[in-house]
């Protein structure tokens, strides 16, 4: 069952000001904006890493001020820029992190890892014992995606996960992510409009700690909002 997420008039110092946002179960939402706009802060509030100075954050209707944050994080998949792999653990040990916390036995974990990695064009037998330092950037990020998705989390939080990769690998991983997302609720931070249009059905434009625009992805490119036009024009030039 996919999760719902809600920010209710949250503020944090000068970073966010009275931000409200609702994400419905199964919805995919991209937070887009310039660097320093407050996108990542909003994302980190959704699993309790950052606590607002005022306002409330709810996941599945439960305030994070009183929620069991450890349990919440175990059922939340998170993908960050640079993969965030444990450098001294093998590929399999990294992928098995959440299943072990959830009490899965090794046979179930191995089968799930084998199935998921095969969908990502990674042979389980070839990669399971390798260390992160022996992998390319794209391979590391594939392992990071597998670790986040192996337990089919109801909520996926993604913080510019493909930003450091070359364009070809980036597009491949975007397509892999879309294919594997299942029915999870997704909040995806990016400053790349083409990426936002690929992975999300709704785009929220964040500017200087406030929500400047919230619309369906298909409507964003036609918006007359000045900052939205800058993103559209930049994407057109890059293309």
What are these regions (language model features)?
Residues 63-77, 101, 182, 220-223:
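ABC ATPase NBD coupling module
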Residues 196-198:
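A short, surface-exposed alpha-helical micro-motif characterized by mixed small hydrophobic
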Residues 131-135, 139:
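Conserved ABC ATPase signature
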Residues 208-209:
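Conserved ABC ATPase "signature" C-loop
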Residues 47:
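Helix-to-loop junction immediately C-terminal to a conserved catalytic motif
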Residues 156-159:
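Catalytic Walker B motif of ABC-type/P-loop ATPase nucleotide-binding domains
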Residues 170-182:
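Helical segment within the ABC ATPase nucleotide-binding domain
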